[in-house]
C-alpha cells in the first residue's frame, strides 16, 4: 500500500472520529468535477485498499450552459478511463434556480443510492463551504438549525431515517488545501465558470464579502465561523433532544393540538422548537419565525383567541387548555 500523506491522514482521522464511514461500505460519491469533489474522490480511492469500500460515482448535468454539458462529457470519459462505476444524469431544461436544482440532485442521489445499494452518499463540502453557508444563512435570517445546517452527516431524506447517510469527510479542510492537493496530484479539475458570476448572491459573498471581512476584520474568518457553527450545532441538538422528551406530554394528535400548561412551563427555546415541530406537521411547509411566534403568543392568551391565518387556510385557536389547529 502507498504511504498516506498528512492530508489523507487528517481525512481518515475525521472519518473515524465522526464515525462517517465503515469498512466494506458501498459509497456513492457526488462528483461535480470541481477541485473539492476531485480531491474527495482521489482520497477515497487512496484509502480504499485499507477500508475495502466499493466506490460508485454520480455526476449531475443541470444543462444550464453549454459548458456544463461539455463538462459532463469530459467527466464521463475520464471516469470510464479510470474504470470507476458511474452514472451521468442530465436534467430536463429547468430555470436557473438553486433550490430546484438542489432538489433535483438529491432525487438523483436517492435513486442511484438505491440502484447501487449504497448506504452512504459522500460529498466534498469543506470548512470553507461551511463558513460561507453560515454567513449566507445569517444574512438571510435563520435560526440555529440553519446556521449549523452543513454538518458532518445527516440522512439523505430527513423524513426517512432508513435513507442513506450524507457524509462530508472534507469538513476539516479548507478550499486552498483541496486546490493544493489537486495540483500536487495533477487531477483534471474542471473550472465552473458560473462560480464567477456576481449576479448570484452566493458568489458575491464568496468572492467579495468574505475577502473584505478577512482583510478588515478577521484574517481567520473561516475558522471563526466554523467554530460558531460547531457550537450552535451542539446547542441545537440539545434543544431538539429535550423537545423530543417534552413532545409526548404536550402533543394531542386527535385534535390536532398542543396542551398549553406543560408547554407554557417550558423554557422559551423548547416552546419554539415544539411549536416549530407541531406547525411543520400541520402546515404544508415549514413555518417561518413569525408563524412560530404567533403560536407562542397563544400559550398565554385567553380562551377563544386565535392566530392569523396560516398557509393553506389553517389557523390556531385556544380551546380550553389546548391550542388546536383548524383547517
Swiss-Prot record:
The N-terminal region contains the highly conserved SGGXDS motif, predicted to be a P-loop motif involved in ATP binding. Pfam families: ATP_bind_3 (PF01171). It comes from the Bacteria. The keyword Cytoplasm applies. InterPro entries: Rossmann-like_a/b/a_fold, TilS/TtcA_N, tRNA_Ile_lys_synt, tRNA_Ile_lys_synt_N. Disulfide bonds: none annotated. It catalyses: cytidine(34) in tRNA(Ile2) + L-lysine + ATP = lysidine(34) in tRNA(Ile2) + AMP + diphosphate + H(+). The keyword Cytoplasm applies. GO terms for biological process: tRNA modification. Its main location: cytoplasm. This is tRNA(Ile)-lysidine synthase. ATP binds at residues 32-37. The lineage of its organism: Bacteria, Bacillati, Cyanobacteriota, Cyanophyceae, Synechococcales. Keywords: ATP-binding, Cytoplasm, Ligase, Nucleotide-binding, tRNA processing. Ligates lysine onto the cytidine present at position 34 of the AUA codon-specific tRNA(Ile) that contains the anticodon CAU, in an ATP-dependent manner. Cytidine is converted to lysidine, thus changing the amino acid specificity of the tRNA from methionine to isoleucine. It comes from Synechococcus sp. (strain JA-2-3B'a(2-13)) (Cyanobacteria bacterium Yellowstone B-Prime). It is found in: Cytoplasm. Its EC number is 6.3.4.19. One of its GO terms (molecular function) is ATP binding. One of its GO terms (cellular component) is cytoplasm. Belongs to the tRNA(Ile)-lysidine synthase family. PANTHER family: TRNA(ILE)-LYSIDINE SYNTHASE-RELATED. The gene is tilS.
Amino acid at each position: 500500500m502507498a504511504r498516506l500523506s498528512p492530508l489523507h491522514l487528517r481525512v481518515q482521522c475525521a472519518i473515524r472520529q465522526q464515525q462517517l464511514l465503515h469498512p466494506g461500505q458501498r459509497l456513492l460519491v457526488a462528483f461535480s468535477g470541481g477541485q473539492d469533489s476531485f480531491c474527495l474522490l482521489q482520497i477515497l480511492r487512496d484509502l480504499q485498499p485499507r477500508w475495502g469500500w466499493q466506490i460508485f460515482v454520480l455526476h449531475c448535468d443541470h444543462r444550464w450552459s453549454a459548458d456544463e454539458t461539455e463538462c459532463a462529457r469530459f467527466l464521463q470519459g475520464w471516469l470510464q478511463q479510470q474504470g470507476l462505476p458511474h452514472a451521468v444524469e442530465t436534467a430536463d431544461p429547468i430555470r436557473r434556480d438553486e433550490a430546484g436544482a438542489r432538489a433535483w440532485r438529491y432525487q438523483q442521489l436517492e435513486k442511484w443510492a438505491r440502484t447501487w445499494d449504497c448506504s452512504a452518499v459522500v460529498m466534498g463540502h469543506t470548512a470553507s463551504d461551511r463558513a460561507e453557508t453560515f454567513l449566507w444563512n445569517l444574512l438571510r435570517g435563520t435560526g440555529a438549525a440553519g446556521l449549523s445546517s452543513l454538518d458532518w452527516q445527516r440522512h439523505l431524506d430527513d423524513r426517512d431515517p432508513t435513507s442513506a447517510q450524507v457524509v462530508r469527510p472534507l469538513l476539516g479542510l479548507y478550499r486552498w488545501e483541496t486546490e493544493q492537493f489537486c495540483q500536487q496530484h495533477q487531477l483534471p479539475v474542471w473550472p465552473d465558470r458560473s462560480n464567477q458570476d456576481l449576479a448570484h448572491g452566493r458568489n458575491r459573498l464568496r468572492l467579495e464579502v468574505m475577502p473584505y471581512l478577512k482583510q478588515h476584520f478577521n484574517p481567520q474568518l473561516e475558522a471563526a465561523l466554523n467554530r460558531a457553527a460547531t457550537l450552535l450545532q451542539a446547542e441545537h441538538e440539545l434543544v431538539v433532544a429535550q423537545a423530543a422528551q417534552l413532545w409526548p406530554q404536550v402533543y394531542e394528535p386527535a385534535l390536532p393540538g398542543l396542551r398549553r400548561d406543560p408547554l407554557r412551563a417550558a423554557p422559551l427555546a423548547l416552546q419554539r422548537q415544539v411549536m416549530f415541530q407541531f406547525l411543520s406537521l400541520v402546515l404544508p411547509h415549514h413555518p417561518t419565525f413569525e408563524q412560530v411566534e404567533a403560536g407562542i403568543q397563544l400559550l398565554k392568551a385567553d380562551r377563544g383567541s386565535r392566530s392569523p391565518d396560516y398557509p393553506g387556510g389553517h389557523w390556531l385557536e385556544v380551546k380550553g387548555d389546548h391550542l388546536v389547529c383548524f383547517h
